[in-house]
């Protein structure tokens, strides 16, 4: 049993990989003061509720864009499972056939995982890989594995949080799929509608502009990330794979282990 850990700015996603299949997934809010003992206690309870013996773990692969919790995650696996977790970084890109052709020669490990998994799903294709997380990231990758362009914008969670922080009288809302009717006569539902449809329109609009700029290419578009599943039934522009990042982390982990064993 392998633990695949995706540490984002908002949530830590723990996924178990058992007998060749992705099993349970659990989400814990990302918080920089979480200790190893606290993380272990939460995992143990979640695993117990699912009738899983978490101590059957034999390895751990971690992608993290929130460095403040890396120490606690490492300590948890070492202290409670006797496992040294494998952390994925953009330094592994060349090993995986990815060339980072950006002004900054580094990207988040989650983006690398997304790209690796997308290239496996769609080999020999020019790709537009979108991660709809805390920040929405549009990655442009050609069939040779060159990451040559990007667009970054606020994610849905950022937009919801900005309403709370920047207004005094508006209600706090959770964005779920509204009705197909966009217009509402109630404040809360109209705010939910604006956030939901406004965010989706932004994503679809950016995609259309990218496709126009890259008109000479036949881009395969694939999306993942925490917010992506909310839009599965309301857009035909996106091919959504909610496990894309998790699949990529697993692929990179296997490559790193294989490379280490081959030395």
Swiss-Prot record:
Coiled coil: none
InterPro entries tied to this protein: ATPase_NBD, Type_III_PanK
Catalytic activity from the UniProt record: (R)-pantothenate + ATP = (R)-4'-phosphopantothenate + ADP + H(+)
Cofactor(s) required, per the database record: NH4(+); K(+)
UniProt-listed Gene3D superfamilies: 3.30.420.40
GO cellular component, one term: cytoplasm
Active site, UniProt feature: 110 (proton acceptor)
Binding sites annotated in the UniProt record for ATP: 6-13, 134
Entry's Gene Ontology molecular function annotations: ATP binding; metal ion binding; pantothenate kinase activity
Cofactor binding description: A monovalent cation. Ammonium or potassium.
Keywords linked to the UniProt accession: ATP-binding, Coenzyme A biosynthesis, Cytoplasm, Kinase, Metal-binding, Nucleotide-binding, Potassium, Transferase
Binding positions (substrate): 108-111, 187
Record's function text: Catalyzes the phosphorylation of pantothenate (Pan), the first step in CoA biosynthesis.
Subunit record text: Homodimer.
Assigned protein family: Belongs to the type III pantothenate kinase family.
Name of the protein in question: Type III pantothenate kinase
Naturally occurring in which organism (per UniProt): Anaplasma phagocytophilum (strain HZ)
